[in-house]
A protein has these predicted regions:
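Cytosolic regulatory regions of ion transport systems
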Residues: 1-446
Length: 446
């Protein structure tokens, strides 16, 4: 598969590194030679110094026979123009990074397709949706719904009150449990567990279950005493903060703190009256306490500085806030942030990359999530007739090491999978796998 990535900024560089490990034919183009200099020598990809809006430059990188053209420069207009040109030169599919929500409205989708832009990616909106998912419940690190919530993936950290510590999973399976443990994150290692593995204190455990049994997962995880989120404090008035404030449920009260007065005035215009805008320094603990930090269930740090976000979440934790979320755009800091136990880590580069990665897959995939600090991916496949996954019961499929089937949705009903489950055409199957394994599992669904 020939993939051209236009823009060697943070998103483009991360995506190029990710895809180069897949042994795809990757070309990364940018008009800044300095950005490209270290990449070609360290990764299996070609770099070309050329403008993505130059017809000659696009011809040089071979846009005419590109299977996928991805424009992720910081400039929305350049991305749209580059995709239009690439399509007219012969590129089969194009993706543009944007920062304008209006472009995503369903009524505009066909309009952009006619212009030559097949898909639009808005990283800030994707990040905001991830944040809202993670703060819906204070006891959950990750929360993802499949097929409208028929099946749910929950990631939560094991504390002292957890009921399932130090018990082999095969013993837990002897009770007719309404969940499946799909992965365990322990220190810097992610395990796809087997029957003799045990859950230990401080592990982050990923469960799949149905909505009916979410309270049961909360009970066995020892999180029943965690307060439900009603009050949310956001530090930093970025575009992600705006989208987050717009997406939170109506029952949540939101405060945004930012030290730029002009930005605060702009936020007041953009957001409705239920969101309180405070002009002040979010690093000032006295200010945060005065604004009700001790009565806040969720604290979200979204400044442009990863270090500030990490430290602010640590401080909020010490003040008794049960749920903290930090935007950490420096990938090198993600592991450290997790080891400091700051809560949920958001990285829009990784979120964007996982959405684009989905477009490369040949099987019918409706959802791909990148679990950044777990080094794992979760994907929702739709099963086709005569595909390999339907030939045997799950226990006899011979799935690659590092992969597991978390559950399936059949006729709108979530089902927790066991070894004796027979997967049928039309099922929606949720697969959990270690990072970069999706292509290996994909062949089972073709």
């Amino acid at each position: 598969m020939k993939i051209i990535i236009a823009g060697a900024g943070a998103v483009g560089t991360h995506l190029a590194k990710l895809l180069s490990r897949e042994k795809q034919d990757i070309i990364l183009m940018d008009d800044n030679e300095e950005r490209l200099s270290t990449l070609s020598s360290n990764f299996d990809l070609m770099t070309v110094t050329a403008s993505p809006t130059s017809i000659q430059g696009l011809k040089e990188v071979g846009a005419r026979d590109a299977d996928l053209f991805i424009a992720v420069t910081p400039d929305e207009s350049r991305n749209m123009t580059a995709c239009m040109l690439a399509t007219n030169l012969g590129a089969k599919k194009t993706v543009a990074r944007i920062d304008n929500y209006e472009y995503l409205l369903p009524k505009n989708k066909e309009f952009f397709k006619k212009l030559g832009v097949d898909s639009l990616i808005y990283p800030e909106m994707l990040a905001a949706k991830e944040i809202v998912s993670s703060i819906r419940m204070s006891w959950v690190r990750q929360w993802w719904e499949f097929c409208g919530g028929s099946l749910i993936l929950i990631g939560t950290k094991m504390r002292e009150k957890a009921e399932i510590l130090d018990i082999p999973l095969h013993q837990l399976a002897e009770t007719d449990k309404p969940y499946h443990v799909v992965a365990i994150k322990r220190c810097n290692e992610t395990l796809i567990p087997r029957g003799d593995d045990v859950i230990k204190l401080h592990d982050i455990v990923y469960f799949t279950t149905t909505r009916k049994y979410v309270p049961y997962i909360r009970k066995i995880a020892g999180k029943e005493d965690y307060a439900d989120v009603r009050n949310v404090m956001i530090m930093g008035g970025s575009r992600i903060a705006v989208r987050t404030a717009q997406y939170v449920p109506d029952y949540m009260q939101v405060k945004i703190i930012d030290n730029d007065l002009n930005r605060c005035n702009r936020l007041t215009e953009l957001l409705d009256d239920k969101v309180m805008i405070i002009n002040g320094d979010g690093r000032d603990m006295d200010l945060l306490i005065e604004e009700g930090l001790k009565n806040t269930e969720a604290f979200v740090a979204l400044t442009e500085n990863s270090e500030t976000n990490i430290l602010s979440c640590l401080a909020a934790k010490r003040m008794g806030v049960s749920k903290t979320v930090a935007e950490v755009e420096n990938i090198d800091y993600i592991g450290m942030a997790e080891s400091l136990d700051i809560g949920t880590v958001i990285n829009k580069k990784m979120i964007t990359a996982s959405h684009i990665y989905q477009m490369m897959l040949d099987a019918d995939v409706s959802n791909v999530k990148c679990l950044s600090f777990a080094n794992a991916d979760v994907a929702e496949f739709t099963v086709k007739a005569d595909s390999k996954i339907t030939k045997h019961q799950v226990k006899d499929l011979g799935l690659p090491k590092g992969t597991t089937i978390g559950g399936l949705i059949r006729q709108g009903e979530g089902v927790v999978v066991t070894g004796n489950t027979q997967i049928l055409p039309g099922d929606h199957v949720v697969v959990f796998c270690l990072s970069m394994m999706i292509k290996k599992i994909e062949k089972y669904f073709n």
